[in-house]
């Protein structure tokens, strides 16, 4: 009985990942970083900057508690909830 109880305790400790936080790519450095507690969503925002796209395409990567809602209709936001799932987009 003691062996069974000890085994269950060890398995519980191994299976629980206490203090785990999500990892997402962030800008401007585009490197993987731990998200603050409570922020479990990775996001990628893309848009064209400047008049008629003269300044090029822009990207914002980061962490959030919920998927950010774009303030402008031309901002595309993609959210995911796995570690480092918000990689820098490939441009056509």
UniProtKB/Swiss-Prot annotation:
A GO cellular-component term linked to this record: extracellular region
Record-annotated disulphide pairs: 24-42, 35-63, 67-79, 80-85
Endpoints of the signal sequence: 1-21
InterPro entries in UniProt: Snake_3FTx (IPR003571), Snake_toxin-like_sf (IPR045860), Snake_toxin_con_site (IPR018354), Toxin_cobra-type (IPR054131)
Tissue specificity as recorded in UniProt: Expressed by the venom gland.
Keywords of the record: Acetylcholine receptor inhibiting toxin, Disulfide bond, Ion channel impairing toxin, Neurotoxin, Postsynaptic neurotoxin, Secreted, Signal, Toxin
Annotated localization: Secreted
Domain of life: Eukaryota
Molecular function, one GO term: toxin activity
Main location: secreted
Family: Belongs to the three-finger toxin family. Long-chain subfamily. Type II alpha-neurotoxin sub-subfamily.
Function according to Swiss-Prot or TrEMBL: Binds with high affinity to muscular (alpha-1/CHRNA1) and neuronal (alpha-7/CHRNA7) nicotinic acetylcholine receptor (nAChR) and inhibits acetylcholine from binding to the receptor, thereby impairing neuromuscular and neuronal transmission.
Protein name: Long neurotoxin 3FTx-Oxy2
